[in-house]
Design a protein with these regions (language model features):
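Conserved beta-strand in the GNAT
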Residues: 56, 63-72, 88, 93
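Conserved GNAT acetyl-CoA-binding A-motif
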Residues: 115-126
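Conserved active-site alpha-helix within GNAT-family acetyltransferase domains
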Residues: 105, 109, 117, 129-147
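Conserved GNAT-fold acetyl-CoA-binding loop/helix
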Residues: 22-43
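Conserved beta-strand-loop-alpha-helix junction that forms the acyl-donor binding cleft
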Residues: 124-134, 151-154
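A short beta-loop-alpha structural element at the N-terminal edge
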Residues: 1-15
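Conserved acetyl-CoA-binding loop-helix of GNAT-fold acetyltransferases
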Residues: 91-94, 100-113, 140
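A short helix-loop-beta-strand connector motif used in the catalytic cores of GNAT acetyltransferases and
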Residues: 44-56, 88
Length: 154
């Protein structure tokens, strides 16, 4: 079942944030420290922000199996960009012990439906090129590159 995250979910969300960070740290230790993206206190603030919904997949015991952090974005009165509403996926993770059960696909589908229900034009996300499994997952969901970030390490 997919539902909105609640304060009681923060400990498990924190564990999953650490799993994501470890993948990023292993792929790009020059950029990512070992840790997690948000503290428990920051998560409490995010949970109250209607512009930053967090969807969670839970099992029959209401235990979190995965999450999808979202952010509503909209450029208004921009000289170049059109005024469209976007749902940006800031982070999507399924517990590494539960992968392969289509939980990620269910979370992504719920995010798409949530975006539609909220009048969004599109859904976007960023994925690090070192995270090949995530890239394959998003491609299997039908996402295509919108823009490409490039770098040269000096």
């Amino acid at each position: 079942m997919i539902r909105m995250a609640q304060e009681k979910d923060i400990p498990k969300i924190g564990e999953l944030l650490s799993q994501v960070d470890l993948v990023h740290h292993e792929g790009r230790p020059d950029i990512f420290k070992i840790g997690r993206k948000y503290s428990s206190e920051e998560l409490k603030v995010i949970l109250k922000d209607k512009c930053r919904p967090i969807l969670v997949s839970v099992d029959g015991n209401d235990e979190v199996m995965g999450y999808c952090f979202c952010i509503f974005q909209q450029h208004t009165d921009d000289s170049v960009l059109t005024d469209i509403k976007t749902l940006y996926i800031d982070d999507l993770c399924v517990d590494e012990d539960l992968r392969g059960r289509h939980i990620g696909k269910e979370l992504y589908a719920a995010a798409v439906e949530f975006a539609r229900e909220n009048g969004c034009y599109n859904l976007t996300l960023n994925v690090w090129s070192c995270n090949q499994s995530a890239m394959r997952f998003y491609e299997s969901c039908g996402l295509v590159p919108q823009k490409v970030g490039m770098e040269k390490i000096l």
